[in-house]
């Protein structure tokens, strides 16, 4: 049996909190991300604050099911603008977050659109092309600046 050959080990760190964590409070725009894109989003939030005076609230989406709608919607209602940053294709977890915001907080959106930054194709590109597709802090900053100016 294959299961007998699998070594089980304790997790390095137990995550006690699930849902969405406000990684950086802000008031002008909500940026939702997870994993590696959280670090790019935090870097972009610092650039936005320092260079443009834009206060970005960054959400760390740690689990989707069940979705922490309360934290997500509270942030979007406060800022009025919403951007999802993800590494995967644009149809990934961001589409679920955008649908939730559109269903339950659309009247609070001040911008003409809600953005998803991610790979614009149905499949992930080969690793040597990732730098063309993965959102960076500068790309996030440019998109948020455009979103706030609308």
Residue ranges and their predicted role:
Residues 1-150:
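Thiamine diphosphate
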């Amino acid at each position: 049996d294959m299961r007998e050959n699998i070594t089980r080990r304790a997790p390095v760190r137990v995550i006690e909190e699930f849902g969405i964590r406000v990684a950086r409070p802000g008031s002008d725009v909500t940026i939702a991300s997870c994993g590696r894109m959280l670090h790019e989003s935090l870097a972009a939030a610092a650039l936005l604050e320092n260079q443009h005076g834009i206060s970005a609230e960054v959400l760390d989406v740690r689990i989707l099911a069940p979705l922490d709608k309360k934290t997500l919607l509270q942030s979007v209602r406060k800022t009025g603008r919403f951007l999802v940053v993800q590494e995967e294709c644009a149809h990934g977890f961001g589409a679920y977050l955008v649908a939730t915001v559109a269903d339950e907080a659309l009247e609070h959106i001040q911008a003409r659109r809600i953005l998803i930054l991610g790979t614009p194709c149905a499949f992930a590109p080969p690793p040597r092309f990732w730098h063309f597709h993965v959102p960076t802090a500068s790309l996030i900053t440019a998109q948020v600046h455009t979103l706030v100016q609308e």
